[in-house]
Amino acid sequence: MISDSMTVEEIRLHLGLALKEKDFVVDKTGVKTIEIIGASFVADEPFIFGALNDEYIQRELEWYKSKSLFVKDIPGETPKIWQQVASSKGEINSNYGWAIWSEDNYAQYDMCLAELGQNPDSRRGIMIYTRPSMQFDYNKDGMSDFMCTNTVQYLIRDKKINAVVNMRSNDVVFGFRNDYAWQKYVLDKLVSDLNAGDSTRQYKAGSIIWNVGSLHVYSRHFYLVDHWWNTGETHIVKKDYNGEWK
């Protein structure tokens, strides 16, 4: 059975209450946030607040597939956030394709695929993204990139493959929607690859359970939370918003 975790809609409610109560946490840069510590929910929607950017999601996916650790290799214009966190050489840690497919990180995808192929009931089907040396690697050569995803565990139950995502930190607006798209892609690929290895398996994608140490909204996106609280709508263009958090 799947734990009776919260849903995305319930996460919205908790964040909305935090904003209404002005329960702010100030981050290291002095920016106000609202935050849920130890968030755990079923990712039953592809975004929490805002709207999907399918064009960027596809570009990021292509970059992940390349396994490049250099932000210049992101197709199209390199997003400012990646430029800001990259080292003086334009290098980062958080190419998630590198994290699961590279031999330099011990081929996590292949290890997980082999484990679940041999032992469908296994609890060892894990892709480990981060590493102990991240304590030092995150600021190498002027970088500021401490990988946000720790591990993703895959459990096969009742012919469904469930993903349990474990993160240290996740931005609700830009972070979650892009990370969800990536995790959905990997889950679907894992299902396909396991089924291709044995036609009798007929596995399907199950739930994605999202566990985060700090799930947060930055002040620049408070208007989205407020708009949802007042209207039930998850997105509005900022120029059209006329509330307190303009």
Curated annotation (Swiss-Prot):
Top-rank EC class of the record's enzyme: transferase
Stored SUPFAM superfamilies: Thymidylate synthase/dCMP hydroxymethylase (SSF55831)
GO MF annotation: an example: deoxycytidylate 5-hydroxymethyltransferase activity
EC number: 2.1.2.8
Entry keyword set: Transferase
Annotated organism of origin: Enterobacteria phage T2
One Pfam family named in its UniProt record: Thymidylat_synt
Active site: 148
The name this protein goes by in its record: Deoxycytidylate 5-hydroxymethyltransferase
InterPro entries listed in its UniProt record: Deoxycytidylate_hydroxyMease, Thymidate_synth/dCMP_Mease_dom, Thymidate_synth/dCMP_Mease_sf
Highest taxon of the lineage: Viruses
Similarity field: Belongs to the thymidylate synthase family.
Catalysed conversion reaction: dCMP + (6R)-5,10-methylene-5,6,7,8-tetrahydrofolate + H2O = 5-hydroxymethyl-dCMP + (6S)-5,6,7,8-tetrahydrofolate
Record gene name: 42
